[in-house]
From Swiss-Prot:
The chain crosses the membrane at residues 29-49, 88-108, 126-146, 149-169, 198-218, 266-286. This is Phosphate transport system permease protein PstA. CDD domains: TM_PBP2. Keywords: Cell inner membrane, Cell membrane, Membrane, Phosphate transport, Transmembrane, Transmembrane helix, Transport. Part of a binding-protein-dependent transport system for phosphate; probably responsible for the translocation of the substrate across the membrane. It is a multi-pass membrane protein. It comes from Yersinia pestis. One of its GO terms (cellular component) is plasma membrane. Residues 83-286 form the ABC transmembrane type-1 domain. The keyword Protease does not apply. It holds the Pfam family BPD_transp_1. It is found in: Cell inner membrane.
Length: 295
C-alpha cells in the first residue's frame, strides 16, 4: 500500500510539474506576443515622428510665424495667416462646445442618470464619438454652407464644436460620477440646494478631470482637415472675418502637400511639425493636470 501511495504521489507531482511548465510556457508566449505588438506599434509611431521632425525642422523659422502663405513657386513665405485662422477657429469652437458639453455632462451625471432622455443622449453621444469627422463636415455643409451659399469660418467653428462636444460630455459625466455620493448626501443634509451642491462640491472636486477632457478635445480638433474642407475652406490672405472663407493650418497643409512646388511642400512639413508639437504639448499638459488630481 505504501508503495502504491508513493507511486500515486509521484504521478501527481509529475502531472503538476507538467501543468506548471505549460503555464509558464503560455505566459512566455503571451509576453512575447504582447511585446511584439507593442514594438510594432512603436515602430510606426517613431517612424512617423522621425519623418515629421527631419522633414519639418528645415522649415521652422521666424518667417513661418510672421509671413503669409506665398504664391505658387515662390521662395520664402510662412503660415502666419493659417496659424491665426486655426487659432481663431479652435478658440470659438471651444467657447461654444465646452459649455454645451459641460452642461450636458452635468445633466447626465446629476439630473438624468437613468432617465430615458439620458440614455438617448448617451447613445447619440457614443455615435458622435465614433463618427468620422468627414461625416460631421458634410452635415454642417448641408445645413449651413448650402443654405448660406458660401463657405465661412463660422461653418468651420460649428463643425469643430460638434466634434468637441461629445468628448467634453463623456469626460464631464465620468468625472462627476467619480465624486462620492457621500459628499452629495452631506450637502443635502445641510439643506444645500442641488444647483449649489453641484457648483460648489461636485464640479469643484472634478475640475481637473474636466479640464483634462477639454484639453484632449482641443487636441482632437486641432488637426482636423476633413470638416474644414467642407465648411471654412481656406484662402491665401490674412483674414479674421468668420463670415467668409478663412485660412487654417490643416487645409493649407493638405493643399501645399498635394502641390508640385517644393517651397509649398516644405511649408507643409513645417506645418505638420507645428501641429504635432502643439498636440503633443496639450496631451502632456492634460496628463500632468490629471496626475496632480490623482495625487
Amino acid at each position: 500500500m505504501v508503495t502504491i501511495d508513493m507511486r500515486n504521489d509521484a504521478t501527481l507531482m509529475e502531472s503538476r510539474r507538467k501543468k506548471q511548465a505549460w503555464r509558464r510556457q503560455k505566459n512566455r508566449i503571451a509576453l512575447v506576443l504582447s511585446m511584439a505588438t507593442m514594438l510594432f506599434g512603436l515602430f510606426w509611431l517613431i517612424w512617423i515622428l522621425f519623418s515629421t521632425v527631419t522633414k519639418g525642422i528645415d522649415g521652422m523659422s521666424l518667417a513661418l510665424f510672421t509671413e503669409m502663405t506665398p504664391p505658387p513657386n515662390t521662395a520664402g513665405g510662412g503660415l502666419a495667416n493659417a496659424i491665426a485662422g486655426s487659432g481663431l477657429l479652435i478658440l470659438w469652437a471651444t467657447v461654444i462646445g465646452t459649455p454645451l458639453g459641460i452642461m450636458a455632462g452635468i445633466y447626465l451625471a446629476e439630473y438624468g442618470r437613468k432617465s430615458w432622455l439620458a440614455e438617448v443622449t448617451r447613445f447619440i453621444n457614443d455615435i458622435l464619438l465614433s463618427a468620422p469627422s468627414i461625416v460631421v463636415g458634410l452635415f454642417v455643409y448641408t445645413i449651413v454652407v448650402a443654405k448660406m451659399e458660401h463657405f465661412s469660418g463660422w461653418a468651420g467653428v460649428i463643425a469643430l464644436a460638434l466634434l468637441q462636444v461629445p468628448i467634453v460630455i463623456r469626460t464631464t459625466e465620468n468625472m462627476l460620477k467619480l465624486v462620492p455620493d457621500s459628499l452629495r448626501e452631506a450637502a443635502y443634509a445641510l439643506g444645500t440646494p442641488k444647483w449649489r451642491m453641484i457648483s460648489a462640491i461636485t464640479l469643484k472636486a472634478s475640475v481637473s478631470g474636466i479640464l483634462t477632457g477639454i484639453l484632449l478635445a482641443i487636441a482632437r480638433i486641432a488637426g482636423e482637415t476633413a470638416p474644414l474642407l467642407f465648411t471654412s475652406l481656406s484662402n491665401q490672405f490674412w483674414s479674421t472675418d468668420l463670415t467668409r472663407p478663412i485660412a487654417n493650418l490643416p487645409v493649407t497643409i493638405f493643399k501645399f502637400a498635394m502641390s508640385p512646388f517644393a517651397e509649398w511642400q516644405n511649408l507643409a512639413w513645417a506645418g505638420v511639425l507645428l501641429i504635432t508639437l502643439c498636440v503633443l504639448l496639450l496631451n502632456i499638459l492634460a496628463r500632468v493636470i490629471f496626475a496632480k488630481k490623482k495625487h
